[in-house]
């Protein structure tokens, strides 16, 4: 075996400092997702807005209510159940994962 000649510390430092290699990728500097704070409670004003808009809609899901009014999906589901009990919307289709409602005014037309 051939013995390697050891480089001095100065040569190693110069070699490391020279820009021959590409800069190392820094991990963790990627895009950061914006945190959206969703409402957990529903005020009477918001419920009145939802009641007005949902009554005219042909199809309503909990995702539509949650994204439009910035509500948690569970809260949106509770709002739709409440409106269904009031008679503003009517359940059209439902299974264990998703429930689809339709506004009562939209069904009459």
From Swiss-Prot:
A cellular-component GO term for this protein: ribonucleoprotein complex
UniProt keyword list: Ribonucleoprotein, Ribosomal protein
Spans annotated as Disordered: 1-34
InterPro entries xrefs: Ribosomal_eS25
Keyword Ribosomal protein: yes
One Pfam entry name: Ribosomal_S25
Keyword Acyltransferase listed: no
Biased composition annotated in UniProt, kind: Basic and acidic residues: 1-13
UniProt similarity note: Belongs to the eukaryotic ribosomal protein eS25 family.
Record protein name field: Small ribosomal subunit protein eS25
Organism, as annotated: Encephalitozoon cuniculi (strain GB-M1)
